[in-house]
Swiss-Prot record:
Misc note: Present with 1100 molecules/cell in log phase SD medium.
Family under the similarity heading: Belongs to the HDA2/3 family. HDA3 subfamily.
Organism for this UniProt entry: Saccharomyces cerevisiae (strain ATCC 204508 / S288c)
GO CC entries: cytosol; HDA1 complex; nucleus
Name by which UniProt lists this protein: HDA1 complex subunit 3
Length: 655
């Protein structure tokens, strides 16, 4: 047994009990598992905030910005921060491996993301059981990285988006199956679930998973009973502590996710908490150093309470807090645990560190100290090899006679001016100009502020007077109520005494004999008869009113009947007039029809005569044409040549 090796190894911290952790006994089925963040993730988050520095200030300090531009910038910052909180390769792909199926990729992915490291430890525990685990995350590259991480575990992977980084899946006999679903656009018709058993756990990798959606509810209730404690699969949300995911998860329960308050609180918390990204509380660190073995009992029986505390609450920060945080430079260390740093810097064997032992024990303290520049340690203090006595240039040259008692005005008294001194002088002068301008602005606004002060002082006095008036009225009301209460008590006591007197009088009357008892019965009967009379009078009054109402209704009905009869008579008269008009028009139309028929007969006769005449003329024309065809035409002989000569000879004589 190598005792030296055992003593040199890092001691395993003990896990504190549940009471110290602040466990609330949560059995809701929706749990959060905080994760750490790598140094690369922290630096990227700080750079994202720095890139949006001006937009953040404009968003929190002013109200006249372009809403679409600034709001889109804030949403882009939150989206990029959420991507980095999951894995830095989702935003920066410079160091992205060319192939995601090589053997060293899972360890490399877990090293650069605290969330992937915790997920790997959780899957290492789950793979020891015969379980069906569902993981939901963003579609695209997130699922590719998640599949590449799971290739390093002994699990069977089933992906439901139609893609895979591995073209061929080898057959294996792993007992644990991990199902990968995208948080957007799950199509169970195209990609049905390939599991005959229910899901034992649903892991949400990022904040895009909405467990109230219909598809996610289907996964939670898949193959489960509709009633009972186990009708839903337990949900485990992996959330990087103090990151944008933590802010969204916490403030999403307090505000509407589309409201301005939600965006303001999430953005402010992201900016202010960037120096505490992924920093686990000391009570939780032993759980993660032991690879989450603390959760084995819950994994075996998910019905027991969640063994970790609920989500840590966050403050609602103001714009002043955001501005102060933006002016503060953030420094990150590789590890927040000094014991972890000490053991990582020491060698595994005792004989190897030797003289560096003292230096290695103070590594954490050295990292916190910022190394001063050359100008602040040497030249500005006159500490260089040509000036062993550390005398200033005034004493060495005798040229300048300025007062050198203060180190602040060194650049005014020394004979040496460096580039850094010139730059610092320029910055100081610029700051002085800005301060002078601000002072002038404040001087200009002094009268306005005095007016504001006077106005608010007057308002304050008015409010104080109103308050005093209301207070005085309240006191008077209290006194009056007290007096009324005293009077009521006196009257109550008087009523009690009168009731007692009445009882005594009744007793004395009963003791006097039957006559008084008969009088009492008669008095009671008289009282009852009086009540019945009053009741009958009320009934008669109500009947009279009802009778009047019915008479009015009958009168209205009679008037309505009379009006209807008059309208009916008018309509009958109008109908008779229309019928007579129609008869006259029918008679006129019959007369015109007879005349038209006579004209038509006359025209038909004339048309027949014309047709006969036409036929006769056609017959004559045909005879004439036949005669013309039979007629012989005589032929005339002409001498063409002689005729032409004679005509030519006659021309000169005629001329």
């Amino acid at each position: 047994m190598d005792l030296l090796r055992i003593l040199d190894t890092k001691p395993i911290p003990t896990i504190v009990d549940a009471t110290t952790l602040g466990i609330s006994g949560n059995t809701s089925g929706d749990y959060w598992l905080p994760t750490t963040m790598s140094l690369y993730q922290k630096e990227l988050t700080d750079q994202i905030v720095s890139l949006h520095y001006s937009d953040i200030l404009r968003y929190f300090e002013t109200s006249h910005y372009k809403e679409d531009v600034i709001l889109e910038s804030m949403k882009t910052m939150c989206l990029n921060g959420s991507l980095v909180a999951t894995h830095p390769y989702l935003l920066i792909d410079h160091y992205m491996p060319k192939s995601l199926i090589t053997r060293d990729v899972p360890a490399h992915l877990a090293e650069n993301s605290g969330k992937f490291s915790v997920l790997r430890d959780l899957i290492n525990l789950v793979q020891e059981y015969e379980t069906e685990t569902a993981i939901v995350c963003r579609p695209g590259r997130t699922m590719d990285l998640l599949e590449a991480l799971l290739l390093g575990n002994k699990v069977h992977i089933k992906r439901y988006d139609g893609h895979s980084i591995k073209s061929k899946q080898k057959a294996n006999d792993f007992s644990c199956t991990v199902h990968l679903f995208s948080s957007e656009g799950i199509n169970f018709t195209k990609y049905p679930i390939k599991s005959k058993a229910r899901f034992d756990m649903l892991i949400c990798l990022d904040t895009t998973v909405d467990t109230s959606q219909k598809d996610i509810q289907y996964l939670l209730q898949y193959k489960r009973e509709r009633k009972g404690l186990e009708r839903y699969a337990p949900i485990v949300r992996l959330v990087a502590i103090n990151s944008i995911d933590h802010c969204r998860l916490f403030f999403g329960k307090k505000f509407d996710k589309n409201s301005r308050e939600y965006l303001e609180n999430v953005t402010a918390a992201m900016v202010i908490l960037r120096d505490r990204l992924g920093t686990l509380p000391p009570d939780l660190r032993p759980i993660y150093s032991q690879k989450l073995h603390y959760l084995v009992e819950w994994l075996e029986n998910p019905t027991v309470p969640w063994p970790l505390p609920d989500i840590y609450p966050l403050k609602q920060y103001t714009s002043m807090d955001v501005e102060r945080s933006l002016l503060t430079e953030v420094h990150f260390k590789k590890s927040d645990d000094q014991l972890e740093d000490a053991f990582s810097n020491c060698s595994k064997k005792r004989g190897r560190h030797g003289a560096n032992k003292a230096a290695s024990s103070t590594v954490a303290g050295i990292e916190d100290n910022i190394t001063p520049s050359f100008y602040s340690t040497k030249r500005l203090k006159n500490d260089y090899y040509t000036n062993p006595l550390k005398q200033d240039m005034t004493q060495l040259t005798g040229i300048t006679t300025a007062d050198n008692s203060s180190n602040v005005n060194y650049h005014l008294s020394s004979g040496i001016i460096t580039h850094k001194l010139i730059q610092s002088m320029g910055e100081v002068y610029m700051d002085i100009c800005v301060q002078k301008q601000e002072l002038d602005d404040y001087s200009c606004l002094d009268d306005l502020q005095n007016d504001h002060l006077k106005f608010f002082s007057n308002e304050d006095e008015k409010i104080i007077k109103e308050y005093e008036t209301v207070l005085r009225t309240n006191n008077e009301n209290l006194n009056r109520s007290h007096e009324l209460e005293v009077e009521n008590n006196l009257k109550f006591s008087q009523i009690e005494t009168l009731e007692k007197d009445i009882e005594t009088l009744k007793g004395s009357l009963m003791a006097q004999g039957e006559t008084l008892s008969k009088l009492k019965d008669a008095f009671v009967k008289t009282d009852n008869v009086q009540d019945e009379i009053e009741k009958e009078e009320r009934v008669s009054v109500s009947r009279d009113t009802e009778k009047k109402y019915m008479e009015q209704e009958i009168k209205r009905a009679v008037d309505a009947i009379r009006e209807n009869e008059e309208e009916t008579h008018k309509l009958n008269e109008k109908q008779n007039g229309l019928e007579s008009e129609l008869k006259l028009k029918f008679e006129k139309s019959e007369i015109s029809t007879k005349e038209l028929n006579e004209k038509i007969g006359f025209l038909k006769k004339e048309l027949k005569l014309e047709n006969d005449l036409n036929e006769e003329l056609v017959g004559q024309l045909s005879k004439t044409m036949d005669n013309l065809e039979n007629l012989t035409i005589p032929r005339v002989r002409t001498q063409n040549g002689n005729t032409k000569k004679k005509s030519r000879a006659k021309k000169p004589g005629n001329v």
